[in-house]
From Swiss-Prot:
Short name of one Pfam family: MotA_ExbB
GO cellular component, one term: plasma membrane
Protein's membrane topology: Multi-pass membrane protein
Protein name, as recorded: Putative biopolymer transport protein ExbB-like 1
Compartments it resides in: Cell inner membrane
Organism in which the protein naturally occurs: Helicobacter pylori (strain ATCC 700392 / 26695) (Campylobacter pylori)
GO BP terms in the entry: protein import
Native organism taxonomy: Bacteria, Pseudomonadati, Campylobacterota, Epsilonproteobacteria, Campylobacterales
Keywords: Cell inner membrane, Cell membrane, Membrane, Protein transport, Transmembrane, Transmembrane helix, Transport
Transmembrane domains' residue ranges: 14-34, 99-119, 147-167
Length: 189
């Protein structure tokens, strides 16, 4: 199998090789972002669930976050709505970092693969025109080799889009817990 991969890259043009390396980097980035954000969001979601539970049980009067250190009006024992909204936006901004990478990969990888395919087919037609041979036995292997770049682009886009949707749902769940805390703390008088 390794021999066939080496043979493929030896027979491929520069653009196709560049496209396949680019798509491989996309795939590595997709896996890295997904694993990192999955772990980070799981920790953050657990923390906010516990914080909500503590606020409801009266064990704490604010989320455990640096923004709430000594920012309370001690006379009313309330936090300003602006501070609560700033905290919510900060948590959501932090939790969505990296999602744009998955979005970009899922939308551009198929086009990058298609670009590699088109360039490879153009090179093949150029070579066929030069050699003067245009039989099915000559054209079919060239086109099948060229389509590998498109397949690789689609292969990179599918997990990127799927992981994007999974992480987006986790961010939504986190936002619900954060909003519940904001609502509870805003209603305290």
């Amino acid at each position: 199998m390794l021999d066939s991969i080496v043979y493929f890259f030896n027979k491929s043009g520069f653009v196709t090789t560049l496209v396949l390396v680019w798509i491989s980097l996309y795939l590595v980035m997709t896996l890295w972002v997904f694993l990192y954000k999955s772990i980070a969001l799981k920790i953050e979601l657990k923390r906010e669930m516990q914080s909500l539970s503590n606020i409801l049980n009266g064990a704490q009067d604010a989320p455990e976050h640096f923004m709430f250190n000594k920012k309370r009006n001690d006379e009313t024992k309330r936090y300003s709505n602006e501070l609560l909204q700033a905290w919510k936006h900060q948590v959501l901004k932090q939790s969505t970092t990296g999602l744009v990478v998955l979005s970009i990969i899922s939308s551009t990888a198929p086009f990058i693969g298609l670009f590699g395919t088109v360039v490879e087919i153009l090179e093949a037609f150029n070579n066929l025109g030069t050699l003067g041979q245009a039989s099915f036995g000559v054209i079919a292997p060239i086109i099948s080799k060229a389509l590998i770049a498109t397949a690789a682009g689609i292969l990179a886009a599918i997990p990127a889009y799927s992981f994007y949707l999974i992480l987006k749902r986790k961010v939504y769940d986190l936002s619900v817990y954060v909003q519940m805390q904001v609502d509870i703390l805003s209603s305290k008088k």
